[in-house]
C-alpha cells in the first residue's frame, strides 16, 4: 500500500506577513503539519507529500524557507509543483537539492513509487493568475505515458482541468484543456488527477479519469454559482487530502482539526 498526502495552497508570505491583512498562513500550515503528526500512527507509513502549487503567496525566497522549515519536521519526501503565486526560479532553487526538478525550463517531473507513478506538471504562466498546459508539458506527459505502459499514475497540476462553477475562479483557470484531455484519453491505465487553486474539494470526471481538487489550510471560496457572486475568500482551515493505492486509488479529505470523539454507538 502506497500513501501520498496532498497539501495545496499554503500561501506562505515572507517574514510572517498576514496574507490580505487577514490570514496567518504560516501558523495555519503549522497546525496542518501537527495534525499529520497526530494521525501518523493511524494511517501508517506515508511515502510522499505532494504540494500542489501556491506554496508561496508572494514568490519570495524567504517564503520558501518558511515552507521548508515547517514541512521538514515531518521527515517525509516532499515533491512540489508551482502555482500562479509561485516563482518558478525561486521554487526550483529552494528544492533543487532533492534532485527531481529539471535544471531548466518547466518544472515537470516524474517519480516512481512502489504501487504507482507520481507525475507533477507545471501549469504556471509567470505573471498571470490563470494557467496553461503548453506544448512542452503535453509532450512531456505523452512521452511519460508511452513509457509507463498503462501503469497507475497519480498526476498533479495546480490549475484544475475542469470548470468549478465559481465564476471568478474559472476566469483564471486552465488553458489548453482540450489538448490535455486528448493526451489523457490516450492512456489505458488508471490515472488519478489531483490539483489545487480553487481552495475547495471538488470531484469531476476528466477524460474518463477521476479528478479532485484539494482544500486549502487557511481559506476557501464560497460555492456561489451566481454571476454576481462576491469575489473573495472565507477564513477556514480546511485540511488536506490523502491518496492511497490498494488495488485502486482511494482519496480521503482529512480536516486540520480532529473534532470530538470517537463516541460509542
Place the predicted regions along the sequence by residue.
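Extended active-site neighborhood of metal-dependent phosphoesterases/phosphodiesterases
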Residues: 61-142, 179-189, 215, 230-244
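His/acidic metal-ligating clusters that form di-metal
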Residues: 32-49, 130-210, 239-242, 250, ...
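Active-site-proximal beta-strand elements of phosphoester/diester hydrolases
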Residues: 2-14, 115-125, 154-157, 209-215, ...
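Active-site environment of divalent metal-dependent phosphoester hydrolases
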Residues: 12-15, 57-62, 84-92, 126-129, ...
Amino acid at each position: 500500500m502506497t500513501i501520498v498526502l496532498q497539501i495545496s495552497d499554503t500561501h506562505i508570505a515572507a517574514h510572517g506577513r498576514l496574507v490580505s491583512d487577514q490570514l496567518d498562513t504560516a501558523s495555519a500550515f503549522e497546525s496542518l503539519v501537527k495534525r499529520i503528526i497526530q494521525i501518523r500512527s493511524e494511517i501508517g507509513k506515508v511515502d510522499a507529500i505532494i504540494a500542489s502549487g501556491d506554496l508561496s503567496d508572494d514568490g519570495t525566497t524567504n517564503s520558501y524557507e518558511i515552507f521548508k522549515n515547517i514541512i521538514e519536521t515531518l521527515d517525509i519526501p516532499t515533491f512540489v509543483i508551482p502555482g500562479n503565486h509561485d516563482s518558478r526560479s525561486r521554487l526550483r532553487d529552494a528544492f533543487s537539492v532533492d534532485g527531481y526538478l529539471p535544471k531548466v525550463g518547466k518544472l515537470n517531473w516524474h517519480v516512481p513509487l512502489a504501487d504507482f507513478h507520481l507525475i507533477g506538471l507545471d501549469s504556471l504562466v509567470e505573471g498571470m493568475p490563470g494557467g496553461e498546459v503548453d506544448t512542452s508539458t503535453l509532450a512531456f506527459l505523452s512521452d511519460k505515458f508511452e513509457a509507463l505502459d498503462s501503469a497507475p499514475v497519480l498526476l498533479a497540476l495546480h490549475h484544475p482541468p475542469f470548470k468549478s462553477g465559481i465564476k471568478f475562479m474559472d476566469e483564471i483557470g486552465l488553458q489548453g484543456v482540450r489538448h490535455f484531455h486528448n493526451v489523457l484519453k490516450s492512456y489505458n491505465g488508471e490515472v488519478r488527477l489531483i490539483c489545487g487553486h480553487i481552495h475547495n474539494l471538488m470531484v469531476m470526471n476528466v477524460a474518463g479519469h477521476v479528478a479532485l481538487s484539494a482544500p486549502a489550510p487557511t481559506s476557501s471560496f464560497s460555492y456561489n454559482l451566481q454571476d454576481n457572486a462576491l469575489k473573495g475568500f472565507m477564513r477556514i482551515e480546511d485540511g488536506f487530502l490523502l491518496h492511497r493505492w490498494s488495488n485502486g486509488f482511494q482519496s480521503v479529505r482529512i480536516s486540520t482539526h480532529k473534532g470530538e470523539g470517537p463516541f460509542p454507538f
